[in-house]
């Protein structure tokens, strides 16, 4: 085992407070720390300002404060090919993708990890709120971050055990408030910087406008599942299951929600009431399955699952259909399960892995109106 001072750790630095504190903590622990900034997207805004330039300037300032070397690496082509193309393809298919999951799988913990290892790094560290633990046999597990509100294992569900063996999450045991406090105590220039929100390549821009630049919108009818026309939609890709905002349906009674999509006829299905029965299901089929420790997964088992970020866990039964497909039965009916989103499985604090929601099931029947 190497001493810390002989162990090189490349820190993926975004210019935010989390990655800044991750680098600080590793430096304090005596590691040979190198900061690297990834440029994944040409994000010049409407005023000609490139936010990536501002973020890199913050990385430079923090690295100078910490007295560690820093570099920048460009993954724009890989990001376009592996993440953005997938993002557009999913929307074309009427689904609601999660680009953060794909970015972690293909860019941060693949292209970037390979780059770090090529630089002689022993580990790649990031500011994610998750934890890596070795069990008594030396096997690597991923645990939730201690800060329940910030835990990011949902977005890291596609990482393999081999990848996690080369990864450090220095913030995993800390609450966010403590991370801010550490940054202020050490007067890091990013201490007061607000957290980035939304999809990285959209930034603060209007989602509808952004998407329409790449996919032509096809307006069509809004109908109930009984065929009653309630208005028109701007394009199916702009709507997701359970959505209430932006439907423009007036009148009295309960509010209206998106309950499904018909891609063939370009119809957006709507239903009245938050508890609308059409929004509920009791099972799903997921594909693109990744198990962090696949040899420990049995053919059928009980665990908990999340169907969206920051959702409470739900009890489920998982049946393996093939290497790339699972059937997930819910103990209690779930509302607005959305194709394209991630389903992530847990055994207590341990993240088992996850997949992409493909098909929604109710009483043993596929819900065709979901898309």
From Swiss-Prot:
Its main location: cytoplasm. Pfam families: tRNA_Me_trans, tRNA_Me_trans_C, tRNA_Me_trans_M. One of its GO terms (molecular function) is tRNA-uridine 2-sulfurtransferase activity. Keywords: ATP-binding, Cytoplasm, Disulfide bond, Nucleotide-binding, RNA-binding, Transferase, tRNA processing, tRNA-binding. The record marks 128, 341 as: Interaction with tRNA. Residues 98-100 are annotated as: Interaction with target base in tRNA. It catalyses: S-sulfanyl-L-cysteinyl-[protein] + uridine(34) in tRNA + AH2 + ATP = 2-thiouridine(34) in tRNA + L-cysteinyl-[protein] + A + AMP + diphosphate + H(+). ATP binds at residues 12-19, 38, 127. It is found in: Cytoplasm. The keyword tRNA-binding applies. Disulfide bonds join 103-200. The active site is at 103 (nucleophile), 200 (cysteine persulfide intermediate). Its EC number is 2.8.1.13. GO terms for biological process: tRNA wobble position uridine thiolation. One of its GO terms (cellular component) is cytoplasm. HAMAP family: tRNA_thiouridyl_MnmA. PANTHER family: MITOCHONDRIAL TRNA-SPECIFIC 2-THIOURIDYLASE 1, TRNA 5-METHYLAMINOMETHYL-2-THIOURIDYLATE -METHYLTRANSFERASE. Belongs to the MnmA/TRMU family. This is tRNA-specific 2-thiouridylase MnmA. It comes from Oceanobacillus iheyensis (strain DSM 14371 / CIP 107618 / JCM 11309 / KCTC 3954 / HTE831). The lineage of its organism: Bacteria, Bacillati, Bacillota, Bacilli, Bacillales.
